[in-house]
Amino acid sequence: IRDGKDLPAKYSYAQGAMDSLNAKQGRKLCEEKLGLTADLEPCGFFDDNVWFRGIVDLVIVDDDVAWVVDYKTGKSAKYADKGQLELMALTVFAHFPNVQTVKAALLFVVCTAIVKGTYHRASNSTLWEKWLSKYAKMQSAADNDVWNPRTSGLCRRHCAVLECVHNGRN
């Protein structure tokens, strides 16, 4: 989209999705680097006071609506992280004050799947409460150097922490 060219032949399976995005009205920003301060104010990605950073693969801003797309190369959308969509939407709301609705998507270009989410500026405070609560728990763990083990689907075969009680290779 950035260069206005067709995809190389080996990626032709994703050309339809790219054409659809390219046809949308609005200002298209590719690999947009966005930052937020600890007060959740917009700032530059490399600013000294940056607290949160995100890079959005594609943002299309058209008046009060923005489309946000993150391209994924995974073979399955089964474990897609919709939280990434929420954080991208919150960051776009901060940087583009006229935007009232963000239509976000994780576009899995290999398996041709798409995971969508729609977010409204009116829901900002609820979403920020969720994410700031998660951050507070991580900050507390870092401050106290206490990292309680939690089981996940990766423990059995993929965890590198052999001393963890949940590691399946013990």
Question: What function would you assign to each model-found segment?
Answer:
Residues 37-43, 48, 80, 90-170:
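Metal-dependent nuclease catalytic regions and adjoining charged, substrate-binding loops involved
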